[in-house]
Amino acid sequence: MRIKQLIVIILIILVVLTALLPQLTHANAIVNESQMDKEVRQGMHDYHIPGLAVGVVKDGRIVFLKGYGKADDTGREVTPETPFILGSVSKPITATAIMQLSEQGKLRLDEPVLAYLPWLQVDGPTGGREATVRDLLRQTSGWSTYDGRAIMAAQGHTAEEIMERQGKLKLERQPGERFGYSNVNYMLLGAIIEQVSGEPYAAYIENYIFQPLDMTDSYADPSTARENGLASGYQTVFGKLMEIKPDISPALVPAGYLAASARDMTHFLLSQMNGGQYRDATVLSAASTGLMQRYEAGFPYGLGWFTTSEWISHGGDAENYHADVMMHTDGSWGIVVLMNTNDVLLTSLYGNGYGDLSFRLLEAAGNGSLFSSLLIEPVKFGAIAPYLNLGIAALAIWLIWSLYRLVGGPNSARHVSKWLIVRGSLLTVIDLIVPLLFLLQFPVEMGAPWRTILRFVPGWGHALFIIPMLFIFVWLLEGLLLFYRLRRTDRGHEVIEGLR
């Protein structure tokens, strides 16, 4: 009897292995691992990426999943289970939660935001129409990209606290008028999830998205993620990669600070590509998933996704992480790429090399058949660090010379002349007007306030803020000292009288 049972068990195992073998062989045949390795290594070298994880799905299956490089300064290796901060790839997950609550009848997409967040203060052109939940999802609320970047450095534990400290945010355009990407929208959606569900955002996401999708290495609380192996994020500080751990407000997690592994994100991606279903779990109906991904000609955003006629995607940029998620509209191919670095300055100057790498990895996975016509020469990061450091050093030397000139300037009446006044006027332009204009205009050009620039461009950002401030301080001291010297000399009185 025992022999018969043993034979039955062996036969069952053989049947299962026989069924799995073609799938495994097919998966290996689909993706050329050596080519993927080559592309990843080259990209990590070109874009100074310490660690990276990538997952590829094809026709409802994971066909490639691998980690590369280091997760932190201890040398811990990146694996497919290593969590990374997702940046704005958090937004499709937040949007999924909103769509769940809509399906349950707990909220209506076309209801005004104020119906759920009565504390919200809105100023600006409304055109007689209030922003709705759908406007937040589609990025058509009217809030600006600038304000969305400003809140990333704001202080506050909740969305209400952050909005109170920001003051009454003014709408840039009428709600529903046109697309305008802003992190404000998804911060408020996180607050709506809490209000409607009666649960903290983190608990809701973990219970109703992460658990059903078997996302066991994903976290809606950055502190918990750090305790469970989160890859350390790296930023460039004066040209050197350094581990940076900025404080993160829980209110901003829905817009940009969820954490997940590449393995887990392939589960989420598969659910989005399969009408809201992953294995036996259904987190969303096919109708709601289709609504999230629907493409409208001339409009770049669905409900939580960037959309085109062929591709559905989202990128994410936190201070020290980058992420990309892409899937084909026919449900065939999809990719997840997670990186533990971000250099806003280099991507602003040279182009989004990180996103370029993600495209190339998907193209390599598809053996050059997906969108090669869209790929041009790879983005290359220039060696700008030495020049920036040299420029900042020159400004620092100039500042020191200004201080020396101030201390070692004329102390007697015979040195006081009208020429000194003329020179003072010229220095006013150099030491006051130019630095002041720079401090005011640079945030406008960057599209973010100084406090956000300092978080995303540490080192160089701090130097570009502090040095102009010091020049202005030197100008004030120089003016006070000059006035004092003029007042205490007869020649100075003559000069002052002559200028009247």
Please name every model-derived segment.
Residues 30, 51, 80, 85-89, ...:
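Active-site helix/loop module of the DD-peptidase/beta-lactamase fold
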